[in-house]
C-alpha cells in the first residue's frame, strides 16, 4: 500500500507529539519486546500481565496519575480510530475517472451494447449484450453476426484496398494475389463463359452420367484426379501432417470424409432435417440442370441416389464426440496393411499418383483414424454400382467448383444457403466474395500487404508480454490444484513453459524472395477466374505432398495473417495469434487494461488451456501423443471434466440441447482462459496500481474485466444457423460461452455481489484448471 499524506497526518506532525508518533510507528516492535514492568522514556509503565496485579497497580496510583493514564488511553484510541478511518478511506476511494477521447469512445460502445435493465446476476449475457443484440439483427446475406464479423468486415475493406492498389505489392506472390482477385471481379468474362469451364473439366475427367456419357471403367483414375488435382475428399480424406506419436516427422494420414452436408446428423435425423434434405436435393438437381443435364425427371432420380449414398456414408461415420480420445482412434499401419484393411482401393497406385514424384512402397507408414470406418467404406464401395460411384465423385467436384462460375450458380448457392442456414438472399457486393476467396486461397501471398497496413511494429512485443503474463498466471493456478499429483504437475509446468508463441504472421512472408519461392509454382492467369481456382487446388496439393519427406516447420501456419481467430497446435505445442485478431475489440492500446485482459487476454488463456484440455493433455511438451500423466491424475481429471459435460449439456437453444461432450475441449479452454486472464490482470494491478475507471458506467475495473470478456461474444444467429452450430461446432453457443464460464467463477460472483444460488452464482461450480 502506498503512503497517504493527508491534511490530518500533516497536522499530527506539526503538533510535535513525538512520543505517541514513535509508539505508533513502532507498534509491532513494542508488542514483541514488552515484558512485565517495561518502562518508556516518559516514565509511563505498561504491564501486559495478569489482571490481578494490574488491579493492585491501579489502586496504588495517585488521582493525577489515574487521570493522565485515562487521558493518554483516550488520545491513543482516538489516534488509532483516525488512522483506521484513513485506511478505510484509502481502500474505498474511487480511482480517478478517465476522460480522454478514447475512454469516452469505448464507454459509449460499452453502454450501447449493454442492457442495464437486466440483473447481471440473473443473465449476464443479456446484461452485457442486450443492447447490441437489439441494434444488430442478422444482416441480409448472413446467417450469423457478431464482434468477430465486424472485425472481419474491417479487415476485408483493408484487403480490398490493397488488392486494388497496384503499388501495394512488392513481391511477385503479392501480384499473383492481385491477378487472382481481379479475375474474380471480372464478372463480364465470367458471365460470357457461363458453365463452359466446368463442363469441359467434367468431359476431360471421363464424363458424368447426369450430363452426358461417361467412361465406365475409370473409378480408380477419377478418384486419384479429383483427390490430388482438385482437393476433394470422396469416401475419405488423405493429407500430410505431423505424426502425433513422432512430432518431428510428417506422415500420410487417412480419415473419414465425403459428406456434402456439414454433419451426419442431417442425414440420420430425417424428420428434424427434412427441410434441409429437400433443399439439398433441389440444389443438386439445379446444378445438374445448369451443367447441361436436361430434363429434371432424368436428373432427380440419379441425384436422389447420390443423396442415398451419402446417407449410407453418414451411417458408418463416427460421431465427433466419440473421436475425442486420440489415443483410441490413432492407428499406424503400412500401405500393405491398408490394402488388406480397405481392399476396394488400389492404395499403392493411388498414393504414388497423388504423391508423385515421392515414391511410396508397401512399407510406407500411414496413420489411420478409425480403422472400422475404412473397412466399412471399402465394403460399401464394392457393393455400389460403378455408375453411382462415378456420379458421387463427380458431384463432389461439382459442389466444390461451381461457385467459380456465373451468377446462375451463385443464385443456386444462395437459395440453398437460405434453407441450410436461414441466410436471406441479398445483393452482397461482388468484392466481398472475391476478397474472401482470395484471402482463403492466397492469404499468405497477400499477407505482407495486410501486415504492413495494419500491424504496428511493437504489436509483437506487446502481445508477447500479455502471453507471458497469462502463462505466469496459468502456472500459478496449476500450483494450487488439489486433484493433480506432484509428478504430473511438474510435467504440466514443463509443458506450459515449453509452449511456443507465434504472433502476427510467419516470418517468411515478409521476405519477398522467400515468399516468391513458396508461390513459384503457382501462376494466375488474367481474366480466367475458374482456371485460377483450379490451378490453386492443384498447386496446394503439390505443396502438401512435398511436405511428406520433410520435417514439420513452425513457419507453416494453419491460419493466414488477416484471420480473426487463434489456435493451439498440439504436435508443435504452440499457440498462434494472427495479426487479424490483435485489434479492437480484443486489444486496443488506449483502452483500460481491464478490457485488454478481458479481450485478448482471455483469448490467449483459451489457447494456452487447449494444451491441457481433454485432447491437448494427451500430448507432451514435445508434441508427442503419449501417456505422460499418472493414472490417479487422469481419473481425477475425468471427474473434474464430467462436471462440465453435465453443466453444458443442460443448456439449450430453441429447445435443442448443447452437446456437452462434443464441446468439452472448448468449454475447458473457455473456463481456463477466463481464470488465467483474470489472475494475470490482478497481477498487473499489483505491479502497476489501480487503473482509472471509465465514466458513467459505475463499474469497478474488475467488473469491467468481466464485462469486456462478455461483450467479445455478443452475437446473433438465425434458428437454422443455431441448429447447424449445435450439431457441428465444437464451441458452445456464444451465450453459454459467457454464462457457463462466468457462473463457474467465484471472483465474478464476488465482484458483482451475486447472491448464492442465483443463476450466475450456482452453489455447485465446475473447475478444471
UniProtKB/Swiss-Prot annotation:
Any one Gene Ontology BP term: sympathetic neuron axon guidance
Cofactor note: Binds 1 zinc ion per subunit.
Entry keyword annotation includes Metal-binding: yes
Record comment: activity regulation: Inhibited by phosphoramidon.
Principal subcellular localization: membrane
PANTHER family associated with the record: ENDOTHELIN-CONVERTING ENZYME 1, ZINC METALLOPROTEASE FAMILY M13 NEPRILYSIN-RELATED
Protein name: Endothelin-converting enzyme 1
Species, as recorded: Mus musculus (Mouse)
Gene coding for it: Ece1
Amino acid at each position: 500500500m502506498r503512503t497517504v499524506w493527508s491534511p490530518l497526518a500533516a497536522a499530527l506532525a506539526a503538533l510535535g507529539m513525538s512520543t505517541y508518533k514513535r509508539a505508533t510507528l513502532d507498534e509491532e516492535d513494542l508488542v514483541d519486546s514488552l515484558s512485565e514492568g517495561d518502562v518508556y522514556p516518559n516514565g509511563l509503565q505498561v504491564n501486559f500481565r495478569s489482571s490481578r496485579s494490574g488491579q493492585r497497580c491501579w489502586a496504588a496510583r495517585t488521582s493525577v496519575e489515574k487521570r493522565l493514564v485515562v487521558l493518554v488511553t483516550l488520545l491513543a484510541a482516538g489516534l488509532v480510530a483516525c488512522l483506521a478511518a484513513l485506511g478505510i478511506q484509502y481502500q474505498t476511494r474511487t480511482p480517478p475517472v478517465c476522460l480522454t477521447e478514447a475512454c469516452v469512445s469505448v464507454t459509449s460502445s460499452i453502454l450501447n451494447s449493454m442492457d442495464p435493465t437486466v440483473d447481471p446476476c440473473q443473465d449476464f449475457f443479456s446484461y452485457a449484450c442486450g443492447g447490441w443484440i437489439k441494434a444488430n439483427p442478422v444482416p441480409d446475406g448472413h446467417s450469423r453476426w457478431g464482434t468477430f464479423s465486424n472485425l472481419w468486415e474491417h479487415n476485408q475493406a483493408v484487403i480490398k484496398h490493397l488488392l486494388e492498389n497496384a503499388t501495394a505489392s512488392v513481391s511477385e506472390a503479392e501480384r499473383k494475389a492481385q491477378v487472382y482477385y481481379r479475375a474474380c471481379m471480372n464478372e463480364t468474362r465470367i458471365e460470357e463463359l457461363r458453365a463452359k469451364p466446368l463442363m469441359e473439366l467434367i468431359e476431360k475427367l471421363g464424363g458424368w452420367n447426369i450430363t452426358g456419357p461417361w467412361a465406365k471403367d475409370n473409378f480408380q483414375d477419377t478418384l486419384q484426379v479429383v483427390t490430388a488435382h482438385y482437393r476433394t475428399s470422396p469416401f475419405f480424406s488423405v493429407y500430410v501432417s505431423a505424426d502425433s506419436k513422432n512430432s518431428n516427422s510428417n506422415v500420410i494420414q487417412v480419415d473419414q470424409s465425403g459428406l456434402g452436408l456439414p454433419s451426419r446428423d442431417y442425414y440420420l435425423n430425417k424428420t428434424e432435417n427434412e427441410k434441409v434434405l429437400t433443399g439439398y436435393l433441389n440444389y443438386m438437381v439445379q446444378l445438374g440442370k445448369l451443367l447441361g443435364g436436361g430434363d429434371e425427371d432424368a436428373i432427380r432420380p440419379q441425384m436422389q441416389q447420390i443423396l442415398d449414398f451419402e446417407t449410407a456414408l453418414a451411417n458408418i461415420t463416427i460421431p465427433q464426440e466419440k473421436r475425442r480420445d486420440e489415443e483410441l482412434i490413432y492407428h499406424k499401419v503400412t500401405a500393405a496393411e491398408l490394402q488388406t484393411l480397405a481392399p476396394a482401393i488400389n492404395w499403392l497406385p493411388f498414393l504414388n499418383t497423388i504423391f508423385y514424384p515421392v515414391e511410396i512402397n508397401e512399407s510406407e507408414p500411414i496413420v489411420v483414424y478409425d480403422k472400422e470406418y475404412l473397412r466399412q467404406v471399402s465394403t460399401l464401395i464394392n457393393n455400389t454400382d460403378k455408375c453411382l460411384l462415378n456420379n458421387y465423385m463427380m458431384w463432389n467436384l461439382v459442389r466444390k467448383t461451381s461457385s467459380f462460375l456465373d451468377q446462375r450458380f451463385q443464385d443456386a448457392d444462395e437459395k440453398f444457403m437460405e434453407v441450410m442456414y436461414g441466410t436471406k438472399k441479398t445483393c452482397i457486393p461482388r468484392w466481398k466474395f472475391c476478397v474472401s476467396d482470395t484471402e482463403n486461397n492466397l492469404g499468405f501471398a497477400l499477407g505482407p500487404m495486410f501486415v504492413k497496413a495494419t500491424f504496428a511494429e511493437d504489436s509483437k512485443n506487446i502481445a508477447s508480454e500479455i502471453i507471458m503474463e497469462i502463462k505466469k498466471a496459468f502456472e500459478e493456478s496449476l500450483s494450487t490444484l488439489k486433484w493433480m499429483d506432484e509428478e504430473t504437475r511438474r510435467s504440466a509446468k514443463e509443458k506450459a513453459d515449453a509452449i511456443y508463441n507465434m504472433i502476427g504472421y510467419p516470418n517468411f512472408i515478409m521476405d519477398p524472395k522467400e515468399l516468391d519461392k513458396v508461390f513459384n509454382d503457382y501462376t494466375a492467369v488474367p481474366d480466367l477466374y475458374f482456371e485460377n481456382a483450379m490451378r490453386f487446388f492443384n498447386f496446394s496439393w503439390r505443396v502438401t505432398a512435398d511436405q511428406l519427406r520433410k520435417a514439420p516447420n513452425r513457419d507453416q501456419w494453419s491460419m493466414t495473417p488477416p484471420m480473426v481467430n487463434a489456435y493451439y497446435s498440439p504436435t508443435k505445442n504452440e499457440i498462434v495469434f494472427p495479426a487479424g485478431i490483435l485489434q479492437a475489440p480484443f486489444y486496443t492500446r488506449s483502452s483500460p487494461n481491464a478490457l485488454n485482459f478481458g479481450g485478448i487476454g482471455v483469448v490467449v488463456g483459451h489457447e494456452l488451456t487447449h494444451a491441457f484440455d481433454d485432447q491437448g493433455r494427451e500430448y507432451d511438451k514435445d508434441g508427442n501423443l503419449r501417456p505422460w500423466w499418472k493414472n490417479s491424475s487422469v481419473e481425477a481429471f475425468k471427474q473434474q471434466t464430467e462436471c462440465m459435460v453435465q453443466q453444458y449439456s443442460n443448456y439449450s437453444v430453441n429447445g435443442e440441447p448443447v452437446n456437452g461432450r462434443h464441446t468439452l475441449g472448448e468449454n475447458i479452454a473457455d473456463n481456463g482462459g477466463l481464470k488465467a486472464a483474470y489472475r494475470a490482470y490482478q497481477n498487473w494491478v499489483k505491479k502497476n496500481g489501480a487503473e482509472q475507471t471509465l465514466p458513467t458506467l459505475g463499474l469497478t475495473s474488475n467488473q469491467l474485466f468481466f464485462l469486456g470478456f462478455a461483450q467479445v461474444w455478443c452475437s446473433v444467429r438465425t434458428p437454422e444457423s443455431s441448429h447447424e452450430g449445435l450439431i457441428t461446432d465444437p464451441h458452445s453457443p456464444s451465450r453459454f460461452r459467457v454464462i457457463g464460464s462466468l457462473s463457474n467463477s467465484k471472483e465474478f460472483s464476488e465482484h458483482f455481489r451475486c447472491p448464492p444460488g442465483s443463476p450466475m452464482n450456482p452453489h455447485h461450480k465446475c473447475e478444471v484448471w
